[in-house]
Amino acid sequence: MSNKPFHYQAPFPLKKDDTEYYLLTSEHVSLSEFEGQEILKVAPEALTLLARQAFHDASFMLRPAHQQQVADILRDPEASENDKYVALQFLRNSDIAAKGVLPTCQDTGTAIIVGKKGQRVWTGGGDEAALARGVYNTYIEDNLRYSQNAPLDMYKEVNTGTNLPAQIDLYAVDGDEYKFLCIAKGGGSANKTYLYQETKALLTPGKLKNYLVEKMRTLGTAACPPYHIAFVIGGTSAETNLKTVKLASAKYYDELPTEGNEHGQAFRDVELEKELLIEAQNLGLGAQFGGKYFAHDIRVIRLPRHGASCPVGMGVSCSADRNIKAKINRQGIWIEKLEHNPGKYIPEELRKAGEGEAVRVDLNRPMKEILAQLSQYPVSTRLSLNGTIIVGRDIAHAKLKERMDNGEGLPQYIKDHPIYYAGPAKTPEGYASGSLGPTTAGRMDSYVDQLQALGGSMIMLAKGNRSQQVTDACKKHGGFYLGSIGGPAAVLAQGSIKSLECVEYPELGMEAIWKIEVEDFPAFILVDDKGNDFFQQIQLTQCTRCVK
């Protein structure tokens, strides 16, 4: 084994950044000199302002390129009617959110900051605290949601009440700029991050593509497609792989080279990306309720690996694609330009709020009557819900289970009304509710049979596909699972939710049990009382096509 001469290879060699920025301020930066070199001095206030503005912008606006991809669905003759319906709701939602009152999604996310600090940038220390202060200011001052739970011991938790802590990862690099990527990462998309430990045997053209397609299928619709999907093959460690997945899904590595070299540079496999996008379109899942647009795009990145390891990572950025770059240089503080006018992407003929035909359901009547009406319609039927709905999510269900396990039974409200799996953002002044879109249904699957056996949770409303145990429970007890569109939380708050009040557990914040009154609240029948599951039917249809 001969020794090669030393050669340093930048692991992620990126081309020039062509991101469009706007100048936030030229204050809080100055130039100095040290040992003959010019130094950029950055005051702590600059970091706080940067973080505050970046997370504000990302909470209410998305990138123009993303909005264009959504708009393209409306003009695609191959898109299903459900694809187009969901895309239109996303654009309407963005149009409302861009006003800066109701955030794009009710899950305003964990604040993640990746910073690369040039060696000739001096701050005097305390960078993490200054950035965290900016995150704090955003979540306190805007109508966002506090989603972070702090453990008091291994089992007891309390909401931090500020959305802190933020995840802040800072790196030292060459140069005289301080560059950032800020991500507001919701729980739904974060939970669709996976690591698979494979071997060299996977690395053949015949095996790898089929493997990735099968993994992609497991994503389901719970994280609000259309997705930006990222696959990473290889990595010097498991954590390097998953870190690359996160950044790739945020388009941070789009300017990587498209071929490798003997020194181990990361690269994109553009051809495999195209092939996988076609496969995603053929899955049939579409933009949540069947169709073509399961994904907007796919990124596939290849990394070097240890000979004994072959990590494969998969992750997504969801329809709330909240990623934003920022930087500080000698001119001042710069923030990536997001789309301030998403309404321009809505075709003129679709600007009115009419939704076409939907079955109107009056929820202010006995549960037996509501169930009897739903039983008349097949899965995939679009509904317009009107009346009272109970709102509760993870901790609320855990509280209800405690009651059942203790022999206390269920409160009457969980028997009399449908339950919506959700947790509201803060309510702006003059509004009935803050942004209030659905959370992932699957996390509540284990509770359904026990609840329905006692007459509760007979109609469930949430987002995404569910497990077989829910289908079985609904068939056994005569229940239904209705799908709400994951993503357009601002549309629901402005157009459908007429009142919001806390029913129980106010100390739990967004995890409390709430009651809402709704008008024309859109939903689809996804699981019925006869054992039919909309998503299983799609899978069977696709399998039949494969056999043919």
Swiss-Prot record:
Cofactor: how and how many bound: Binds 1 [4Fe-4S] cluster per subunit.
Induction conditions: Is expressed under aerobic conditions. Is repressed by glucose and anaerobiosis.
Residues that bind [4Fe-4S] cluster: 105, 224, 318
Keyword Metal-binding belongs to the record: yes
GO molecular function: 4 iron, 4 sulfur cluster binding; fumarate hydratase activity; metal ion binding; oxaloacetate tautomerase activity
Listed GO biological process terms: tricarboxylic acid cycle
Record carries keyword Calcium: no
InterPro entries assigned: Class-I_Fumarase/Tartrate_DH, Fe-S_hydro-lyase_TtdA-typ_cat, Fe-S_hydro-lyase_TtdB-typ_cat, Fe-S_hydroAse_TtdB_cat_sf, Fe_dep_fumarate_hydratase, Fumarate_lyase_CS
Cofactor dependence: [4Fe-4S] cluster
Pfam family of the protein (one): Fumerase_C
Oligomer status and interactors: Homodimer.
Cited function: Catalyzes the reversible hydration of fumarate to (S)-malate. Functions as an aerobic enzyme in the direction of malate formation as part of the citric acid cycle. Accounts for about 80% of the fumarase activity when the bacteria grow aerobically. To a lesser extent, also displays D-tartrate dehydratase activity in vitro, but is not able to convert (R)-malate, L-tartrate or meso-tartrate. Can also catalyze the isomerization of enol- to keto-oxaloacetate.
PANTHER family referenced in this protein's UniProt entry, alphabetically: FUMARATE HYDRATASE CLASS I, AEROBIC, FUMARATE HYDRATASE-RELATED
Record protein name field: Fumarate hydratase class I, aerobic
Organism listed in the record: Escherichia coli O157:H7
